[in-house]
Every structure is written in structure tokens, then in C-alpha cells.
């Protein structure tokens, strides 16, 4: 990984690409050196490249944007090809930042050059589905690779218990950081899973009364599940990238690359914890499966700093209130989630609406009141400060 590095900033200068360099190096070590390895898909076009990141976010990088990135980055080193690949990764990051911030590429690139937090650098490279918080003992373990924050918007690559940054090495002592989830091997007796209640991409016949919330604290997850079903269809195979089934349970790969294993006993536990009501048994079954997958991911990510203790604890963290957007992310849909407004949802755009008290599905200008659709216009939601989200 000595083929390239980020040049150190000068005194008084606001310039720092150490976080991006550290993340790119970790991706090279984990997935391979080529952008085609580090991203899900890279397709050359007449004017540049179409890029799909591992979380599903899509950007188009022009030759001119790549050239401007190369001129501005100050990546240095002996490996010209590695530097060129790092430039490509940085350009894609900046293009995503421009798309998410609704700004021009040059403005996004300028902002990028000023530095980035470790988490934002990882997220912007499409790694949200692979992120695992690493405590010092895991981050400093032999034969392990990670990244850690060193100062404000600076980061360092961690290899074999040492952080590498600014041409220096230092041992991991009390540092926390991030590592990428290991591959989960395919079970030899696995087969494609089947969910017979509805064909792939077909929306629920009655999203209101077919399944609705019965547990007071799990509204964020319930509204996210309903929103996903109204966007991609009721069948989990339309929401996730792929699902296989074996005698031991299910292996689920989400759209952002996160893979979880779910046992039959865990699925039963999720059914009890979800406490779903409704008139459509098949719809409830599919919603329970999504709920269980969300809880399993919460366990792997140690949601609320306690879900890692076990699946039962992870289920509890889904039932005690959450931050809007967390549940959509745990379904693998972070890259497809966008900010909206209560006015946009009231006009008919589907999504979720949340405040400090509750989170609801909104479809066709109506919000979900525990299984009953009610007109959003004129409701208390129009006058309360809330967070509106939509899927694209």
C-alpha cells in the first residue's frame, strides 16, 4: 500500500485527503486494486464512466471530472496505476457528494479536498453495508485491516495493529475505528428462497389493513417495511438482492451488500416481537421476514451499542424507538433513500414521515394510523416538525 499516499497539508492550509486515501487503500486490500473490484460495476462510455457503488448508488463520471480530480488531489507515490485508480475512486466520491448535496461537481470536489470524517468517507464510497465499528482489541488484532480517525477530518489505514498515516506508524492503543465485514460463505445445500404470497415487484393489495403496527415502539421499522413494499413490491426477493434457503435458515444479501444469516428460530422470535396485526396472512409473513432481517443486521452492527449481545436484544432495540432512516438503512436501502418534505408527501409521493413521537407510512397523500388511512392534508402532521423520507 506504499504505491500512493495523500500529501500532507501545509501549515495553515485547509486541505486533507487522508481519510479518502485510507479508505481507498482498505478497499484495495479487501476487494482488489481496480475500481471495477472496489465498486459493484464500472462501465466505460464515450464521455466517461457509469459507476454503481456497492450500496447501489449510481453516478456518471466524465473524463473532464476525472481530469480535474487528478489535478487537484495531490496523491503521490511510485505506482502510477494505483494513483490513477485512486483518482477514479475520489472522482466518484465527489460526484456522489454533488448528487446528494444537489451542487455542481467542482463545488463538491472543493469541499472534498478540505477533508472528511472517517465515517463519511466510508459511506460516500458506498460501503454502508460492510461497515462494522471496531473496538481497540479488534482494530489492533494481527492480520486485520481497518481505518481510524486521527484528528478532526484526518484518518489512517490500520494494518496488523499499526496505523499508517503521514509517513508514520503508531500502534493501536485505545483507538476505535471501522473494519469491513468478512465474506459469508455460501452454504453448500442452499437453494433460492421462495416467498409464495405475492409475485416479485407486486405491491400489497391493502398496505393499510393487510399488516399494521401492534407494538408501540417499532413504528420506524414498520413504516420502513411498508414503504419498501410499496416501492419494490411485497415479496422480499424484490427488496433484497438475493435470498437463499437451507435447512439451517436463510442467507440474505441486501442491496447495499450487507449479508446476514437468519435461523428459523430467529424468524419465529421476530414474529413474536413484531406483534403485527392485519387481515393478510401472506403480507404479514413477508413483513415478519423483513423485520427479522432488520433485527439480524442490528445485531451484527451492535445497534444502540447493545444489540450485539444477541438476537433477542437486537429485537428489543427495534421496539424502543429509533432515529428516522435507520430502518430503511437496515433493509439495505440507504443509497435509495432521499430527503422529502411533508408537502411533497401530501401531494402523493410515497414515503415515511416521523417526529419525536411516531413514524408513519404515507401513500397517495394518506398516512397510516395503525391500519387506517387518514388524509395528511389538514392533519397535525402538516404543522409539526418532522422528517420526511422517500425511496427513489
Give names to the regions the model predicted.
Residues 33-38, 234-239, 327-336:
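Catalytic cysteine-centered active-site loop
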Amino acid at each position: 500500500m506504499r504505491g500512493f499516499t495523500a500529501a500532507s497539508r501545509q501549515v495553515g492550509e485547509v486541505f486533507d485527503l487522508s481519510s479518502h486515501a485510507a479508505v481507498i487503500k482498505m478497499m484495495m486490500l479487501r476487494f482488489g486494486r481496480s475500481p471495477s473490484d472496489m465498486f459493484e460495476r464500472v462501465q466505460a462510455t464515450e464521455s466517461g464512466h457509469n459507476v454503481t457503488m456497492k450500496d447501489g448508488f449510481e453516478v456518471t463520471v466524465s473524463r473532464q471530472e476525472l481530469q480535474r480530480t487528478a489535478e487537484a488531489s495531490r496523491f503521490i507515490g511510485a505506482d502510477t496505476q494505483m494513483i490513477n485508480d485512486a483518482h477514479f475512486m475520489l472522482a466518484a466520491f465527489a460526484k456522489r457528494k454533488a448528487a446528494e448535496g444537489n451542487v455542481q461537481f467542482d463545488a463538491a470536489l472543493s469541499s472534498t479536498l478540505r477533508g472528511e470524517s472517517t465515517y463519511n468517507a466510508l459511506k460516500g464510497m458506498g460501503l454502508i453495508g460492510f461497515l462494522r465499528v471496531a473496538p481497540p482489541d479488534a482494530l489492533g488484532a494481527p492480520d486485520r485491516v481497518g481505518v481510524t480517525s486521527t484528528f478532526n477530518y484526518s484518518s489512517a489505514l490500520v494494518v496488523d495493529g499499526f496505523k499508517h498515516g503521514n509517513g508514520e506508524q503508531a500502534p493501536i492503543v485505545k483507538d476505535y475505528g471501522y473494519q469491513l465485514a468478512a465474506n459469508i460463505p455460501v452454504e453448500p445445500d442452499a437453494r433460492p428462497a421462495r416467498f409464495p404470497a405475492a409475485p416479485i415487484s407486486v405491491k400489497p393489495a391493502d398496505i393499510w389493513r393487510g399488516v399494521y403496527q401492534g407494538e408501540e415502539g417499532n413504528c420506524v421499522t414498520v413504516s420502513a417495511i411498508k414503504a419498501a413494499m410499496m416501492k419494490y413490491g411485497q415479496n422480499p426477493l424484490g427488496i433484497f438482492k438475493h435470498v437463499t434457503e437451507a435447512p439451517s435458515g436463510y442467507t440474505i444479501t441486501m442491496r447495499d451488500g450487507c449479508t446476514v444469516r437468519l435461523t428459523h428460530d430467529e424468524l419465529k422470535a421476530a414474529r413474536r416481537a413484531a406483534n403485527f396485526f392485519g387481515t393478510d396472512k401472506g403480507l404479514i409473513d413477508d413483513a415478519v421476514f423483513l423485520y427479522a432481517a432488520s433485527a439480524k443486521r442490528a445485531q451484527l452492527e451492535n445497534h444502540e451499542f447493545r444489540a450485539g449481545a444477541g438476537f433477542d436484544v437486537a429485537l428489543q432495540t427495534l421496539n424502543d424507538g429509533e432515529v428516522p432512516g435507520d430502518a430503511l438503512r437496515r433493509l439495505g436501502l440507504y443509497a435509495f433513500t432521499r430527503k422529502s418534505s411533508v408537502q411533497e408527501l401530501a401531494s402523493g409521493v410515497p414515503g415515511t414521515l416521523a417526529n419525536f413521537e411516531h413514524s408513519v407510512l404515507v401513500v397517495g397523500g394518506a398516512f397510516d394510523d395503525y391500519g387506517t388511512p387518514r388524509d395528511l392534508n389538514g392533519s397535525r402532521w402538516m404543522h409539526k416538525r418532522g422528517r420526511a423520507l422517500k425511496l427513489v
